[in-house]
Amino acid sequence: MAIKKPAIFLDRDGVINDVIDRGENFFVYGKKVRWTAPFKFNEFKLKTGIAEILKLIGQSGFLRILVSNQPDITYGTMTLPEHEKIMAEVKKLPLDDIFICVHGRDDNCECKKPKPGMLFSAAEKHNIDLSSSYIIGDTQSDVSAGQAAGCATVLVDSIYNQDVTADIRIKNLADIIKII
């Protein structure tokens, strides 16, 4: 039997790219939100140095797996062509695989974080040892998915997640290199 590998699961919005401040009175699917994913390609901006950070993670022996909820397609706040343009840029990054859930919160799927379905699917596909893996995110749903899968949880610090508790809190993604 092949040796199981460790992975670093990464959320997309708020971890590898900037989130968008929509202001105090913005609603998506009936829920008031301030910080969102980019809805259009011209709003999409990768974090500085992300490609190099991902290379270093890979050189440290970890698989790099993107696990991202993208319900804005379902909610109608993002078109499929805009999503595809954004994902074309993401696919240029040194990632080993990408798992996307486009379901809305009412769809009751197993893949949408905080459920761990995307992590379990990646673990099965890539023979990943979840107990020696990390999930890096910026929301409670990222932390909850990692906890449910048995991963160490890492939170990228932000103004909107001060009430979220994870195993490790970092200022930016580059800080993970010191930890792994």
Residue positions per predicted region:
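Active-site loop signature of alpha/beta-hydrolase-fold enzymes
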Residues: 15-17, 73, 142, 161
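Active-site flanking residues adjacent to catalytic metal/cofactor-binding acidic residues
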Residues: 10-12, 68, 137-138
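Hydrophobic "anchor" residues on beta-strands that sit immediately upstream
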Residues: 7-9, 65, 134
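Active-site neighborhood of HAD-like aspartate-dependent phosphohydrolases
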Residues: 1-61
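Anionic group-transfer/hydrolysis microenvironments
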Residues: 13-15, 70-71, 115
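Asp-based, Mg2+/Mn2+-dependent phosphohydrolase catalytic module
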Residues: 2, 78-97, 106-135, 139-180
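A short, structure-level motif marking secondary-structure boundaries and short turns
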Residues: 37-40, 71-72, 103-105, 127-128
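Substrate-recognition element of Asp-dependent hydrolases with the DxDx(T/V) motif
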Residues: 50-87, 95-104, 146
